[in-house]
Regions:
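Short amphipathic alpha-helix that is part of the acyltransferase structural core
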Residues: 1-32
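Conserved acetyl-CoA-binding loop-helix of GNAT-fold acetyltransferases
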Residues: 73-86
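Conserved active-site alpha-helix within GNAT-family acetyltransferase domains
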Residues: 101-121
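A conserved beta-strand-loop-helix scaffold within acyl/acetyltransferase catalytic domains
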Residues: 24-37, 41-42, 46-68
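Active-site beta-strand termini and strand-to-loop segments that position acidic
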Residues: 41-43, 127-130
């Protein structure tokens, strides 16, 4: 199994994942010029994606955490997470935040993020002060 993580464009994320993202309650807009994405390829198949958006010089929002069902439990999300965090830390933010589904919330809590609020839809807003 050959795994590769690299930056990808929004149009690729939208084309490959929009339907799956929405069915998993992960928000994605058709046009988004503000989010940076990283994709995970296994044997040249795009199987997972994570993103982030710079809210301000000191605040970065983590977004669009998704791995296709058949590739879960293969360290895809862990590798994407680490790749994204390493890139984000180069920007020297003071705060990271995210809106989490039930699927992504455990990883955020394990990484030190604290729950700020829970929406009526079950989406949890978390923050981490660096």
């Amino acid at each position: 199994m050959s795994m590769r993580i690299c930056p990808i464009e929004h149009k690729t994320v939208y084309k490959k994942f929009a339907t799956e993202l929405r069915s998993s309650r992960v928000a994605i807009k058709k046009d988004d010029t503000k989010t940076e994405y990283f994709g995970c390829y296994i044997n040249d198949n795009l199987v997972g994606v994570v993103g982030y958006q710079k809210i301000s010089d000191k605040h970065i929002r983590l977004k669009t955490d998704f791995v296709r069902l058949q590739y879960r439990r293969r360290k895809v999300y862990s590798n994407l997470w680490e790749f994204r965090i390493n890139r984000i830390l180069l920007l020297k933010p003071e705060v990271l935040s995210a809106y989490c589904t039930e699927m992504s919330l455990p990883k955020y809590l394990k990484s030190g993020f604290e729950v700020q609020s829970v929406g009526k839809n079950g989406i949890t807003y978390v923050k981490l002060k660096l």
